[in-house]
């Protein structure tokens, strides 16, 4: 399936800025990838001394393969980039559009455990306006990858700047990292906040403060 024009534009913008997730080309179909992942996951689980003949575990390698390709890492494939509705700002609306508490679940690329949090996204309309649900879908697309939160925040910013044809975009993310919570230091209360500010959100203290306020 050919990539949409929006997907091509966003991918190009990220590559030009060095913000694309590190990836190498893969010529395999999604079904072929699932078969290979299932095979290797079966070997990994066997090395962990799990009995894959047990009825609770027998389908686990297949479930994990499907989850990786079709769900939690589906954002690695730009064929899954959301269909974007951008409309001309004919009404001349020029006040901040802000979407709070966008739920996001991603995966830490260092340990492949969960990142769980919320995003706040805002923009000042110029030439274009985007359908509100598309903002949520863009956040989700980039979250469905192995990620670091700093890159994820920047990817959402650049994607919206590209599609809206304006620098005036801001993104803030607050998340719990299970690589901190469930292993290592095992800190169950800390959260991580990242921001990516563009245009007037970066240059104007009042606009920045309005965005960062509840």
Curated annotation (Swiss-Prot):
One GO BP annotation of this record: tetrahydrofolate biosynthetic process
Keyword Hydrolase: yes
Enzyme class: hydrolase
Pfam short name (any one): GTP_cyclohydroI
EC number from the UniProt entry: 3.5.4.16
GO molecular function, one term: GTP binding
Reaction equations catalysed: GTP + H2O = 7,8-dihydroneopterin 3'-triphosphate + formate + H(+)
Biological or metabolic pathway of the protein: Cofactor biosynthesis; 7,8-dihydroneopterin triphosphate biosynthesis; 7,8-dihydroneopterin triphosphate from GTP: step 1/1
Quaternary context: Toroid-shaped homodecamer, composed of two pentamers of five dimers.
PANTHER family named among the record's database cross-references: GTP CYCLOHYDROLASE 1, GTP CYCLOHYDROLASE I
Protein family according to the UniProt entry: Belongs to the GTP cyclohydrolase I family.
Name by which UniProt lists this protein: GTP cyclohydrolase 1
Species assigned in the record: Shewanella loihica (strain ATCC BAA-1088 / PV-4)
């Amino acid at each position: 399936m050919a990539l949409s024009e929006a997907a091509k534009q966003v991918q190009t913008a990220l590559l030009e800025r060095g913000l694309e997730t590190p990836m190498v080309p893969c010529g395999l179909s999604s079904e072929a990838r699932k078969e290979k992942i299932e095979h290797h996951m079966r070997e990994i689980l066997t090395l962990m001394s799990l009995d894959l003949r047990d009825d609770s575990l027998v389908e686990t390698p297949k479930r994990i393969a499907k989850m990786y390709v079709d769900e939690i890492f589906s954002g690695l494939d730009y064929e899954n980039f959301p269909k974007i509705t951008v409309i001309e700002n004919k009404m001349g609306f020029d006040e901040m559009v802000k979407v709070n508490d966008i739920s996001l679940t991603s995966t830490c690329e260092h340990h492949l455990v969960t990142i769980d949090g919320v995003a706040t996204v805002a923009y000042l309309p110029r030439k274009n306006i985007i359908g509100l649900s598309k903002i949520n879908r863009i956040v989700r697309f980039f979250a469905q990858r192995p990620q670091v939160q700093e890159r994820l925040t920047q990817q959402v910013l650049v994607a919206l700047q590209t599609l809206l044809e304006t620098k005036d975009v801001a993104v803030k993310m607050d998340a719990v990292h299970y690589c901190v919570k469930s292993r290592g230091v095992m800190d169950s209360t800390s959260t991580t906040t990242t921001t990516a500010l563009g245009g007037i959100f970066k240059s104007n203290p009042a606009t920045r403060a309005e965005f960062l306020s509840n």
